[in-house]
């Protein structure tokens, strides 16, 4: 099993998806959430998560408001567990993980599902991710690794792939038994220690995960001071990096994906509605001889194939009633 490399003094960033290549840089701390459209998700083959278990909250802020409204005790198992799951979800968005909470009575042991949009994979399918959160005060044994392995066999549709990654998250660091079991596993697995306030403390992954191309992944310990200048307290934080650069926040990734999808649709030279964009993908999948995402996202489709797609789409649109 591999312990994430430790790096010091690097303060750069990485653009996850551009039609042009950018150098490493830092991103602004201001975030704007870009909800991906069905068209964008389909273009990049991003699966949609199952329906959430709760209708009254979908992030930490709305959960805390709901918990206060119903007077849910903060020490209750439900409050502690749900709070931690949303905290983990929020923390991992910093590292290009888009996650949804699905934990509930019939969750098959899975708390969060989503995709990991690592740099250099912008032309490929993002890694599907299954997450188990173990918000326990006691030490965790090797059985939690075997439990995570079992979730692969019960994963939702869209997460039953050979590239699906399992992530165990706990406020406690991995014991030797956990590390050894993780190393022997034939599944691509990660262990992350995330404290209840969202601070990342430890990140480990096994050799099987390495095969999926996460070699450039590393860590950096960054130091700072508290906002209270008089106290002079020094803070330290572990962050994940990619080839020595900051991994972009998921908000930035979503913006890039949205912009790329719009540019891709516009590149066909047709003024298409949302429905017609989906039909363009339908036609491309029927006309093109190879995988549509590999051809279209890499912009390697030939002029002849492009003309075939446009002609087939125009014929389909002409056959539709004018109201559409």
Residue ranges and their predicted role:
Residues 2-324:
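Mixed-charge (Asp/Glu-Lys/Arg
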């Amino acid at each position: 099993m591999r312990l994430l490399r430790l790096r010091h003094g690097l303060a750069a960033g990485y653009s996850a998806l551009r039609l042009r290549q950018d150098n490493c840089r830092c991103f602004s701390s201001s975030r704007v959430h870009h909800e991906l459209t069905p068209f964008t998700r389909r273009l990049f083959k991003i699966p949609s998560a199952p329906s959430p278990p709760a209708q009254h909250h979908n992030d930490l802020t709305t959960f805390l408001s709901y918990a206060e409204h119903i007077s849910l005790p903060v020490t209750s198992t439900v409050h502690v567990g749900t709070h931690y799951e949303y905290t983990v979800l929020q923390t991992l968005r910093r590292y290009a993980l888009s996650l949804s909470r699905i934990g509930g009575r019939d969750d098959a042991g899975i708390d969060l599902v989503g995709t990991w949009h690592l740099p250099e994979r912008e032309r490929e399918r993002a890694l599907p991710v299954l997450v188990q959160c173990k918000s326990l005060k006691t030490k965790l044994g090797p059985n939690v690794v075997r439990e995570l392995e079992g979730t692969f066999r019960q994963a939702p549709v869209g997460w039953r792939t050979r590239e699906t990654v399992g992530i165990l998250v706990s406020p406690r660091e991995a014991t030797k038994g956990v590390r050894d079991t993780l190393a022997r596993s034939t599944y691509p697995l990660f262990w992350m220690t995330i404290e209840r306030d969202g601070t990342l403390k430890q990140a480990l992954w096994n050799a099987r995960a390495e095969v999926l191309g996460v070699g450039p992944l590393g860590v950096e310990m960054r130091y700072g001071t508290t906002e209270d200048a008089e106290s002079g307290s020094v803070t330290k934080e572990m962050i994940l990096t990619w080839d020595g650069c900051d991994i972009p926040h998921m908000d930035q990734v979503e913006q890039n994906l949205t912009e790329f999808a719009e540019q891709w649709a516009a590149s066909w030279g047709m003024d298409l509605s949302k429905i017609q964009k989906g039909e363009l993908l339908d036609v491309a999948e029927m006309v093109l001889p190879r995988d549509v995402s590999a051809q279209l996202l890499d912009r390697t489709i030939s002029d002849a194939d492009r003309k075939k797609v446009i002609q087939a789409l125009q014929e389909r649109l002409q056959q539709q009633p004018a109201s559409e």
